[in-house]
Regions:
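PLP-dependent enzyme catalytic core of the Aspartate aminotransferase-like
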Residues: 164, 310-314, 319, 323-353
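Phosphate-binding glycine-rich loop
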Residues: 64-103, 121, 301
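Conserved PLP-binding catalytic core of the aspartate aminotransferase-like
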Residues: 270, 282-314, 330
Length: 353
């Protein structure tokens, strides 16, 4: 670091994203991207005509996308705010609803950016351990005088709470915002969007990166009461009014409108997940009951870090977290059936060594 860096940032540990290799071809099962191409409707929407408009700023109000999203989710446009990826939505939420005297409560094993953002903004963290089986006990979040964020389904475990459990947390914290990070909800979770009109302290965040094949476009949605969304827009318009580029606005709108393609690819991933889970269990691996587009798995026969490195050496990328309680587990993104067969064949060779 340079001598000019603010002392407040010297102790911040930045987030470590999953590998994005540029120099070698891998079976890439490490960052929970979709293995399928974007919808043909998206390709058509991002036309040459739209490319020519890149000389102009995008619509800061995201008008057309909001109209489409409002119809899709059964909300009003003023209950939704698009973000440059759901990460931006979440960051804005922490900026709006937390500060140095108002902590953020979250699980010890969950999305790593929560702790990074707390460090960056000097927000106290209240870290709540998951149970021994990696499930989250909603009662641990009752009656906290803190902002709460729950990834549901959780990452990297893939486990999900029913909507009723989240509702219990909302009821027990009427004076604090409860953020539900639903990045993976389309693969088997139960969305809390239907609760928005009943709880003005609920903020739901979803992404287009996983189930709508737009990870590279960077688009997320925050959904909640009109007053919560107004708070987020206060942050947005104080930082970057043009946060969504023109092509992403068109791509996101088209992705929401193509329900047939969404369901086809979503179902394919869920089916492949079930088959892969069965195959891993037949090989003696422990596999959590994922409701996401990945599996969290371990074996007593080999160390998780060792498996990760050997798979990478043989051309298969998965995710390993060198962290307490999960150092022997791997997170494996669900790819196409062909990709998962290659993964399993490679795994078999390693296990025979």
């Amino acid at each position: 670091m340079s001598k000019y860096l603010s002392p407040k940032l010297e102790t911040v540990t930045p987030y470590t994203p999953g590998e994005q290799p540029q120099d070698q071809q891998y079976i890439k099962l490490n960052t929970n991207e979709s293995p399928y191409l974007p919808s043909p409707a998206v390709v058509a929407a991002v036309s040459e005509h739209e490319v020519e408009k890149l000389r102009l700023y995008s619509d800061p109000a995201c008008t057309d996308l909001l109209k489409t999203a409002a119809v899709h989710f059964g909300l009003q446009p003023d209950q939704i705010m698009p973000g440059n990826g759901s990460d931006e939505n979440l960051f804005f939420a922490l900026r709006a609803f937390c500060d140095e005297t108002h902590p953020l409560a979250y699980a010890d094993i969950t999305y790593g950016c929560y702790s990074v953002w707390c460090g960056l903004m000097h927000i106290p963290s209240h870290i709540i351990p998951l149970k021994e089986d990696f499930t989250l006990d909603p009662a641990d979040y009752y009656g906290l005088n803190e902002t709460i964020v729950i990834a549901n389904p959780n990452a990297p475990t893939g486990l999900a709470l029913p909507r009723s459990a989240i509702e219990g947390v909302l009821k027990a914290n009427p004076d604090n915002v409860v953020i539900v990070d639903e990045a993976y909800v389309d693969f088997g979770g139960e969305s809390c969007v239907p609760l928005i009109d009943r709880y003005d302290n609920l903020l739901v965040v979803q992404t287009f990166s996983k189930s709508r094949q737009l990870a590279g476009a960077r688009l997320g949605l925050a959904m909640g009461s009109a007053s919560l969304i107004a708070d987020l827009n206060r942050v947005k318009f104080s930082l970057n009014p043009y946060n969504i580029n023109r092509l992403t606005l068109k791509a996101g709108q088209a992705a929401l409108e193509d329900a047939v393609y969404f369901e086809k690819t979503r179902a394919a991933i869920v089916d492949t997940r079930a088959w892969t889970k069965q195959q891993l269990e037949a090989r003696g691996f422990a596999v959590l009951d994922s409701r996401s587009n990945f599996l969290f798995t371990s074996t007593q026969k080999k160390n998780g870090g060792e498996l990760y490195h050997k798979l990478k050496k043989k051309g298969v990328l998965v995710r390993h977290f060198d962290a307490p309680r999960i150092e022997n587990w791997l997170r494996i993104t669900i790819g196409t059936p062909e990709q998962m067969q290659i993964f399993l064949n490679t795994l078999d060779k390693i296990m025979e060594e």
